[in-house]
Every structure is written in C-alpha cells, then in structure tokens.
Design a protein with these regions (language model features):
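Active-site pocket scaffolds in enzymes
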Residues: 234-266
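Buried hydrophobic-core signal for structured, non-transmembrane domains
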Residues: 24, 75, 134-138
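Beta-strand-rich N-terminal accessory domains
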Residues: 10-70, 77-81, 222-241
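Acidic, contiguous internal or C-terminal segments within carbohydrate-active enzymes
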Residues: 107-154, 159-160
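Short solvent-exposed loop/turn micro-motifs enriched in small/polar/acidic residues
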Residues: 8, 62-64, 84-89, 116-120, ...
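Active-site/ligand-binding surface loops and adjacent short beta/alpha elements
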Residues: 158-243
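N-terminal amphipathic/basic-hydrophobic helices that include classical n-h-c signal peptides
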Residues: 1-10
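Extended, loop-rich substrate-binding clefts of extracytoplasmic carbohydrate-active enzymes
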Residues: 77-129
C-alpha cells in the first residue's frame, strides 16, 4: 500500500501470523493497525485527528517537551520539537519477513541541524503467537557522548459498543503500587507530586482522572500492565523492560514509555 504525503510516497508494510496482523508506516516506523485475527477486533486507536492523530508514534531523541522547545549543547542553542523528530521522519526498511520487520533511521544533514549527534535508531517488530514484541537499538556513530531519550506512545482502542463505555475499563498493575504522580505544568513535568492509591492493584479509568492532562509516574515498580474491560474478557497485556518512566493520558487510552540514557557508545 502507498500513501502520498505532500511530495513523499509513504509505504505501508504488513506482517502476519495465525493470530495477529500488524500494519506499519515508513513514516515514523509507526504501528498503525493491530488486528486480532480470531475476533477481527482492531486493537489500535484509529488516529482520529479531531482528538489525536497519532496511533503509536516513536518518541526520539526526546520524550515530552523542552522549555521553549530549546536546549543548549556545547554553548550552542538548538530547537527540538515536542517528542523529538523521529515520528516525522521516513525510516528505511532494513529487513522484513512474514512475521517481522526492522526499521532504521540514521542521522543526516537535516537532523544534525537540530540534534548534533550521529546516530542509528533501529526498531524491530516481531509477531510471536498472540504477541507483538518491539525492541529498540540506538547506536552512537561518533566518538562523543550522545544524549537522548527514547519513548513508545501506543494508543489502544476502547470498546464503546454494546453499552460499553470508558468507565468500564481499568489498568491492572503487576506489583502493589502507591503511585506518585507528577503533574504537567505548561507541558513540563512538575517536581510536585500527588499520590494515587490502587484498589487491589487496579486503577479504574475515568475522564476525571485525566482532567489535568497526562499522569506521569517516575517510581512505578510494575513491569506489566493490563488494560482490561471489567464487563467482558477484552484486554491488552503490556510488558516492558528498561523503560523506567510511565505517562498515561486520557484520549482513548494511550501510554508513553520513556527510557532515558545519558550516554551510549557502541
């Protein structure tokens, strides 16, 4: 499938096994569809631009916003947009098979103007039975320290048919948690915190919960979350490793997983 965006031709690629069918865009190496072949149910948020046009953007080389969208490195001021630039760049398809695809984005003349580091970002998507695994590899292609953040921002569809609504969903945590939430102030994370107590390791969803924007959690122990409907068996199990910070926002249901590495040399 081809999609025309301005003067660019964006290629879509699909991988599939006997359980799942996943579709990706070269633009941002973004997962745009994940279908349960047994039920025909679409798992991903549709990307309605009236609410949120994204579906599963990759956040690199920053997660969230910088103050005034600027930072200083080696005495020079650079401008970097919210969530970085990877989601707006066309990735190369490095390799693909029936059930796996590897995307790659490399630094170039344009990226060096706003992010003065030579890098390679590889994202591998693999279908294994009823699981989609995603792995990331960032390479520093120079001999100087490279600063970056890396985040995943998948949005999952909420079933509102057959009398279901947003309040019928909850998040189950793998560990006992006392969640410390950092509020967002002018799109920046505040040092202030508030505590949310879980009920039997679960957090019921409500629009009120997200009335002040996303929830930012920096001390969470759980490495598995389950988004589930408490009236039926519909659920999405999300496991993640080496991503210490969690953001949750209210549009349908989306997660931002953030990994911060101060330097990497490979």
């Amino acid at each position: 499938m081809l999609i025309f965006v301005s003067t660019l031709i964006i290629k879509m690629i699909t991988i599939q096994n006997n359980k799942l069918k996943a579709t990706f865009s070269e633009l941002g190496a973004e997962l745009t569809s994940l279908i349960n072949l047994e039920t025909g149910k679409e798992i991903m948020w549709e990307g309605n631009p009236d609410f949120w046009g994204g579906q599963s953007p990759v956040l690199f080389p920053t997660v969230g916003a910088l103050k005034n969208e600027q930072y200083i490195f080696e005495g020079k001021t650079y401008e970097l947009p919210r969530h970085g630039f990877a989601r707006r760049r066309v990735f190369d398809i490095k390799n693909s098979s029936e059930n796996e695809v590897i995307f790659e984005l490399k630094s170039d003349e344009e990226s060096l103007k706003i992010y003065p580091f030579e890098f390679s970002l590889e994202i591998k998507y693999t279908l294994v039975e009823n699981k989609l695994t995603v792995s990331y590899r960032v390479k520093n292609l120079s001999d100087k320290e490279m600063y970056f953040s890396l985040g995943a921002h998948p949005g999952f569809a909420i079933d509102t048919e057959n009398g279901m609504n947003y309040n019928d969903y909850e998040i189950a945590f793998s560990d006992d948690e006392k969640l410390e939430i950092h509020p967002l102030v002018n799109n920046l994370i505040s040092n202030d915190t508030q505590t949310i107590e879980l009920d039997n390791k679960t957090l019921p969803l409500s629009y009120e919960l997200f009335s002040k924007d996303a929830l930012v959690m920096t001390t969470m122990k759980s490495r598995e979350l389950i988004l589930r409907n408490n009236k039926n068996n519909h659920k999405v199990i999300f496991t993640f490793f080496n991503f210490p910070y969690l953001f949750k926002s209210f549009l349908t249901f989306d997660l931002i997983f953030k990994k911060v590495l101060t330097k990497i040399n490979l």
